[in-house]
Regions:
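Juxtamembrane "helix-exit" motif on the non-cytosolic side of transmembrane helices
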Residues: 42, 67-78, 127-136
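Alpha-helical transmembrane segments in multipass membrane proteins, preferentially the mid-helix core
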Residues: 35-40, 98-99, 151-170
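Membrane-proximal helix-loop-helix units in multi-pass membrane proteins
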Residues: 102-160
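Aromatic-anchored segments of alpha-helical transmembrane domains
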Residues: 62-71, 118-130, 179-188
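Hydrophobic transmembrane alpha-helical segments in integral membrane proteins
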Residues: 2-32
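Membrane-embedded alpha-helical segments of multi-pass membrane proteins
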Residues: 25-33, 88-96, 114, 127, ...
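Membrane-interface helix-boundary motifs at transmembrane edges
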Residues: 41-55, 104-111, 162-173
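A glycine-rich, hydrophobic loop/mini-helix early in the fold
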Residues: 48-103
Length: 197
């Protein structure tokens, strides 16, 4: 069991993941299937006594997927768990965090922010998931990456289909301002902490 966990939480010495293969397309197709199911059953979900539990489940998946990244680094010191190298100041990280708060609180302002962050920034992560080069489907990092990125989209489309949220012209401005704020935080953090990334 120990050998399995060491393997599962680690990464390969040679590339294990390739773009445009079944390992790349399967999570994206599963996400699209999730969209279609949410859209088809939106009225039933909205009227269900379990609707709140569904939202909390999506939020829980987002938070756990983000935390799993750091758990993995702590569990495998050779992967470099140095906090300076792994500060949570990336757009995808904050989209996952904001997405969990957005879906739990049904917050339109957070929806405005992450809608554009996901469609502009995280879309490239889905199309070219380069962090997975040494982590194929038999590794935790593969599952953590896809859960974090696909569930962000699931959360947004859940709020669109089930709760009728929509982006508006001011949403783009709000999203851009939030991105500038995040950029300022990242810039000053990188200036204050030598070697920060």
């Amino acid at each position: 069991m120990k050998e399995f966990l060491i393997y599962f939480w680690g990464q390969g010495d040679t590339p294990e993941f390739a773009l445009f293969t079944p390992a790349h397309f399967a999570p994206i197709l599963a996400m699209i299937a999730g969209f279609l199911l949410i859209r088809k059953y939106a009225d039933r979900i909205r009227a269900s006594k379990h609707e709140e539990k569904i939202r909390y489940g999506i939020a829980f998946a987002l938070i756990c997927s983000e935390m799993a990244y750091y758990w993995r680094l702590v569990a495998r010191p050779e992967l470099g768990p140095n906090p300076v190298d792994n500060l949570p100041i990336a757009v995808c990280v904050w989209a996952a965090i904001f997405g969990s708060y957005m879906i739990v609180g049904k917050n339109q302002k957070l929806f405005d922010i992450i809608y554009f962050w996901l469609l502009s920034g995280s879309l490239f992560a889905l199309l070219t998931p380069t962090p997975l080069t040494y982590c194929g489907p038999t590794r935790l990092r593969y599952w953590q990456f896809w859960t974090e990125h696909t569930f962000g989209y699931i959360a947004v489309f859940y709020m669109i289909f089930v709760h009728g949220m929509r982006p508006y012209p001011k949403s783009m401005v709000r999203s851009y301002i939030a991105l500038l704020e995040l950029t300022a935080i990242a810039y000053f953090t990188n200036r204050l902490i030598p070697g920060a990334n």
